[in-house]
From Swiss-Prot:
Binding site for S-adenosyl-L-methionine: 174, 179, 196-201
Matches recorded under Pfam families: EMG1
Species of the source: Pyrobaculum islandicum (strain DSM 4184 / JCM 9189 / GEO3)
Name of the protein this chain belongs to: Ribosomal RNA small subunit methyltransferase Nep1
Reactions this protein catalyses: a pseudouridine in rRNA + S-adenosyl-L-methionine = an N(1)-methylpseudouridine in rRNA + S-adenosyl-L-homocysteine + H(+)
Length: 221
């Protein structure tokens, strides 16, 4: 199963916010320039009011939670999964299966800021995490040009059947807190759209259940 967390709410503070007092203060506190820190609604809420699509941005914690769920899963440890993070600004992050994601959120933030600064982590040697300028359409095309989406508008399938459908698929999941895909074609061109349960779930919960279903289908559980 290849998971693509699409339109994820992960980005550096955009240029139009660099001079805002909230951003200036946070950057000074951390000893960095405004353009070197992650946009985070928990700290930058007041600065984000005029930002385009503000409700979908500034939530790196979503990416953190998803990566913790995925990287420490049996599916990943057995080599049956890969994950790509497509972000605001059309960057794509690839995380190698053996990468240990920091469980501490502040350490994760520092790791992502290093990634944006250097394009890879670690800066030398074999990279564990890599950052590319690559839009969602290009990424999905490179992954085979076919995908399924987990979305609240989708068809509900029995858990075992869902796992079998996901195990050998590219699975697109929204990485934003509110709203829907800006790229409407993600749903329009999908091979299938499934939903997990009847309640709206956040991204980490969706990924957790998708992984579990795939693990059952693979005989890992």
């Amino acid at each position: 199963m290849i998971v693509v967390l699409a339109e994820s709410a992960l980005e550096l503070v955009p240029r139009e916010l660099w001079n805002h007092p909230v951003i200036q203060a946070d950057a000074k506190r951390r000893g960095k320039k405004p353009g070197e820190i992650l946009l985070d609604r928990a700290r930058h809420h007041l600065a984000m009011s005029s930002l385009r699509d503000a409700s979908k941005r500034g939530r790196p914690d979503i990416v953190h939670q998803v990566l913790l769920v995925f990287q420490y899963s049996l599916l990943n440890k057995r080599g049956l999964g890969r994950i790509y993070i497509h972000t605001q600004g059309d960057y794509t992050i690839y995380v190698r299966w053996e990468t240990r994601i920091p469980k501490n959120y502040n350490n994760f933030v520092s790791l992502m800021e290093q990634l944006y600064a250097t394009g890879r982590v670690p800066p030398k040697g074999e990279p564990l995490i890599e950052l590319y300028k690559k839009d969602l359409s290009t990424l999905l095309r490179e992954l085979g040009g076919r995908w399924v989406v987990l979305h609240e508008s989708g068809v509900k399938k029995p858990f075992i059947e869902l796992g079998a459908a996901l195990l050998n698929s590219v699975v697109v999941i929204g990485g934003f807190p509110h709203g829907d895909f800006t790229n409407k074609w993600v749903l329009e061109k999908a091979d299938a759209i499934y939903k997990i349960g009847d309640e709206t779930m956040d991204a980490a919960q969706v990924v957790y259940r998708a992984i579990t279903a795939a693990e059952v289908a693979a005989g890992l559980l």
